[in-house]
Amino acid sequence: MPTIETRTEPMVINMGPQHPSMHGVLRLMVTLDGENVVDCEPVIGYLHRGMEKIAESRSNIMFVPYVSRWDYAAGMFNEAITVNAPERLADIKVPKRASYIRVIMLELNRIANHLLWLGPFLADVGAQTPFFYIFREREMIYDLFEAVSGMRFINNNYFRMGGVAADLTYGWVSKCLDFCDYFLPKVDEYERLITNNPIFIRRLDGVGTISREDAINWGLSGPMLRGSGVKWDLRRVDHYECYDDFDWEVQWETKGDCLARYYLRIREMRESVKIIKQALEHLPGGPYENLEAKRMMEGRKSEWNSFEYQFLGKKLAPTFKIPEGELYARVETGKGELGIYLIGDENVFPWRWKIRAPDFNNLQVLPQLLKGMKVADIVAILGSIDVIMGSVDR
């Protein structure tokens, strides 16, 4: 009796750009052989808005409100690098109090970023309940942002060259300390709900593994790099702001799979709380930005077009010119290395403003991770990368 043979041909399907697990307008052209992934091609660009070109036709103070739309889960980091690059090129000193306030805001935003990653990621792999608990704590962080800047999610417009836009409001420090004391037990609660769940572990353990060498060669950064055994954190490497004033540890894992990246981000939230509490308890006095004291000391001798008038004499004059030169500045966001390559030519507008987005680089490794995996693993691997398409497409 002849046997019946089943012949299969590769099938190309499109996931996105409207798929609920795509984390934005990302399109994946996936080639399947049955349930197995043969190839994957990410298609990007649906959210491109020309942010680099916009930056080259705006002064710094005009451009800061735009930058929340790169990575809209990490608006404070976008603002930080937007002011850090011209500050370093012009050698502008930031007061100690302003630097502490910046660190507090950045670490709060890091926690909010990880929470926004954790909730949808767990929902993608089938754990629906923790999503609501996680977003409850995330809203509390946005309450703190609203109290100090007037805005919650994006458009905080809080960072300025030389400092921050406004000092911390009355009672804000105690509210933030209360949040830190409240939040740490909640992280333990997330772990009780998720970490030892056998279904969760089977979905992630050994899935989407990246070796140490591949992570370095692909130019990965953030949890994608540290989860593969590379102890690299720009807060330690570049010593920017005042991170050296605090006692904290760089978190890293060696296994390089989705589960390792989950463990890493959970521990990073605890380290961020540790940094915030230290910054609040040792918050120095003094100005929160460079003000007009130096110019006022000169009296009537001060020149209207001097550096002191254009920068120190005002919060930031629209006529402040970016000095001639080039510089690459970078910060460690919740996703990795966010960098700006800046070229100034003694003009109000930058001559070149190149954005190095962390999730754009991290996304490039996705086809390698998906080959040979199952269809059900696609959303788990993509979710573990933590991609925001506003940052990828810019």
From Swiss-Prot:
GO terms for cellular component: plasma membrane-derived thylakoid membrane. InterPro entries: NADH_Q_OxRdtase_suD, NADH_UbQ_OxRdtase_49kDa_CS, NDH1_su_D/H, NiFe-Hase_large. It is a peripheral membrane protein. It is found in: Cellular thylakoid membrane. It catalyses: a plastoquinone + NADH + (n+1) H(+)(in) = a plastoquinol + NAD(+) + n H(+)(out); a plastoquinone + NADPH + (n+1) H(+)(in) = a plastoquinol + NADP(+) + n H(+)(out). Keywords: Membrane, NAD, NADP, Plastoquinone, Quinone, Thylakoid, Translocase, Transport. GO terms for molecular function: NAD binding; oxidoreductase activity, acting on NAD(P)H, quinone or similar compound as acceptor; quinone binding. Its main location: membrane. Its EC number is 7.1.1.-. Disulfide bonds: none annotated. Pfam families: Complex1_49kDa. GO terms for biological process: photosynthesis, light reaction. Belongs to the complex I 49 kDa subunit family. NDH-1 can be composed of about 15 different subunits; different subcomplexes with different compositions have been identified which probably have different functions. NDH-1 shuttles electrons from an unknown electron donor, via FMN and iron-sulfur (Fe-S) centers, to quinones in the respiratory and/or the photosynthetic chain. The immediate electron acceptor for the enzyme in this species is believed to be plastoquinone. Couples the redox reaction to proton translocation, and thus conserves the redox energy in a proton gradient. Cyanobacterial NDH-1 also plays a role in inorganic carbon-concentration. HAMAP family: NDH1_NuoD. This is NAD(P)H-quinone oxidoreductase subunit H. The lineage of its organism: Bacteria, Bacillati, Cyanobacteriota, Cyanophyceae, Acaryochloridales. The gene is ndhH.
